[in-house]
Amino acid sequence: MRRNSNFSSLETNYLFSSIRQKIRSFREKHPEISIIDLSIGDTTQPLHASVIDTFSTSVRKLGNPKTYRGYGPELGLPALKEKLSEVCYRGKVSPEEIFISDGAKTDIFRLFSLFGPGKTIAVQDPSYPAYIDAAILAGARKIVKLPCTKETDFFPVIPQEENIDIFCLCSPNNPTGTVLNREQLKELIDYANSHGSIILFDAAYSAFISDPSLPTSIFEIPEARFCAIEINSFSKSLGFAGVRLGWNIVPKDLKYSDGSLIIRDWERFLCTTFNGASLPVQEAAIAGASLFPNLEAISKYRYNSSLLREALQKAEFVVHGGEHAPYLWVEVPSMIPDEDFFDFFLYQYHIAITPGKGFGSCGTGYVRFSSLGKSENIVAACQRLSQTSVYDRTVLSL
């Protein structure tokens, strides 16, 4: 059996394994020092009581012959789809256009696979690494990286010379923590519609948006129905990171160049490759969706972000994003070499962060802070940051 050649095309990224190794090494050498890990985007707030109650009730039903159920509908429970249509989209998206899944990451790969190999796929730079890996494994012909820098307000520079099949856009963005406004989204939508491109819009962090002038869905721009697919997740909003549940939207107006409906192929694809998400999890999500948009966990993460922003600015760092996302994109002074960013924060502040270059070349000069940590850890990190300016000293070892 020959190896799938797409695996040979994957970029080798040692950064994240190196981070884990450096943290282990530091703890072995300095067990008396506590490290606050703000490098990962994992959630820490517990599930809401109403979600737990519904979840347990649903699971108990599986233990009773009278209430036991086997397979559910492959495309998702109608009640959950109706709830999402109502509370998240105010009827702008019909329940039939919503597909329940086991999470955003698998949706990304499935959608790339739906459109088949040989496509040119554009991703933001910096961006979530899974987009590129999934595109390569699905047989993408070419990956085009769209620079997102502070000079462009982290808006992707659209290539005029490339014929893009699929745009991968994430807003609120991981890692920059910034949000595309309506005018910016409209510009990208107009481009996609005029060039026959598809926008794969990752809205996994939309629950963090508190400004009503900012779009929480690409379908707030009507023309998006002709060029976009949206992905979302319950991981951050309801704390389902370990439970696994998400959804995607494929509009009925979205068509291939020959006029056939993409939604029909998507339904066939899912019925062939996916047996549907867990029924107890979906029922728990119905209870959780009833809490939208007043989510206590999101409020706590937002507060964490505000504390981190204030502390980082007090330490004289330049901070971007974080107002409507759980990530802060922090500039590091040029006096500290890029390859030393992680060690600098580890040894000077005893805080673990993610160097920006792990998200692409345009991440050079930045680090990402996550506000998804426990409140007490965020407070402790802020105390450490506030006590020492980045310009006071530079410590790279102990």
Swiss-Prot record:
Keyword annotations from UniProtKB, A to Z: Aminotransferase, Pyridoxal phosphate, Transferase
Modified residues (N6-(pyridoxal phosphate)lysine): K236
A UniProt-annotated Pfam family: Aminotran_1_2
MF terms (GO), sorted A to Z: L,L-diaminopimelate aminotransferase activity; pyridoxal phosphate binding
Catalytic activity line of the entry: (2S,6S)-2,6-diaminopimelate + 2-oxoglutarate = (S)-2,3,4,5-tetrahydrodipicolinate + L-glutamate + H2O + H(+)
Keyword Transferase: yes
Free-text function comment from the UniProt entry: Involved in the synthesis of meso-diaminopimelate (m-DAP or DL-DAP), required for both lysine and peptidoglycan biosynthesis. Catalyzes the direct conversion of tetrahydrodipicolinate to LL-diaminopimelate.
Protein known as: LL-diaminopimelate aminotransferase
